[in-house]
Amino acid sequence: MKLGLNMGYWGAGNDADNLVLAREADRLGYSVVWAAEAYGSDAATVLTWIAAQTERIDVGSAVFQIPGRTPANTAMTAATLDSLSGGRFRLGLGVSGPQVSEGWHGVRFDKPLTRTREYVAIVRKALAREKVSFEGEFFTLPLPNGPGKALTLTVHPVRDNIPIYLAAIGPKNMELTGQIADGWLAIFFSPESAAENMAPLRAGRESVGLTMDGFDVVPTVPVVFGDDLAACADPLRFYSALYVGGMGSREKNFYNQLACRMGYEKEAIEIQDKYMARDYDGAMAAVPFEFIDQTSLIGTPDRVKDRLSAFADAGVTTLTIATYSGDLQERIQTLQTMVDVLEASGLAS
């Protein structure tokens, strides 16, 4: 199992700290640092900046929003980032959600699975430097009855295959991820629920004659070290309440649906009700400690070390940590402690 670092969204108030953390992760031998985007900063610019100031660590999008870029533009960006970084780019993609897709990008959120399948196919064709022609439900290249012609990407990526990851939560999207992606970007990953939640992913691999060998399972896992478990969990309540309660509409919140599938249906409804009523403190208080404990790494280094085996046994290959607690020096220490803990566990690869 390898380690990664998720910097989250740029512009959240800790940007200078994130650069320091990325450099420290690079020094410590972390395998990848990820950047996110929603409707603020774009991940590509952030990753270019990080890549220019690091040497070994991979840089990855978690994720580029599919409705925000044409497939050709994504291929151009991926090839450029891979070239500038010396072959260190990982392309993470996601469909976002209805509110952002339709409200920010002006793209209807219909048939997201079909759109994703077509999108990835075009990106792969472009990155392989084939002439890009495609006829699908959402994308047709070149457009018919016009002057357009099939073109070939002029940039030569450093690698023959830039790895493509998909952020997936629902069962059908998980199955698609297994079929067409090289890795899965997970959130609220619980080892206790992994066998059931990952079954569609494994089925997707099997349906196209593939196994899980070489497939990268990459959950983002918040990490807080300390002796008091309740105190360690408290900084993660806002993060959990925001996603379970406030990401998306009442009818279309994929994180809320995931919490329900994990056995927290009553609590997920309460969190959403309170969050949408702007009772944010109440929403945070409604997040069960057990949910936080299952989906994060909290407690003493020894407790975290023991917990790592559950993640490894569940199939995690790259454990991407998020440091949501403490000042900069404490977060740097968290990066170092995770390296020590992983090595002590005997699970490092």
Regions found by a protein language model. Name each.
Residues 1-349:
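Active-site-adjacent structural elements that line small-molecule/cofactor binding pockets in enzymes
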